[in-house]
C-alpha cells in the first residue's frame, strides 16, 4: 500500500533591528546561504518562506544576489512568500494605522 504524505514546510528568517552587521553576515554564511544552496538542488521540493522586513533590507543592501535567487525560485513556483508586518509586531497590540503602514512597508 502506497501512501502520499503532504508536508507544509514553512521557514521563518529574522534578524532584529540594530543587530550588528557581522552577526547577520555570519548567520548569512552559516544558515541562509547554505540552505538556499542545498534547496536549489531539490527541484521537487516546495517551501513557504517568511523573511522579516529588517532582514530583507539587510539582504538588499549586502547581498542582493541572494534576493535575485529567491525571486527566481518564486517565479518557478518553488518558494511561496509568506507576508507579515515589517517589524514583526503583534498586530493586535498596535494602532490600526500602524498595522496598515507596516503591512504596506513589507509588501511595498
Outline where the language-model segments fall:
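Catalytic alpha-helical scaffold of carbohydrate-active enzymes acting on polysaccharides/glycoconjugates
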Residues: 1-108
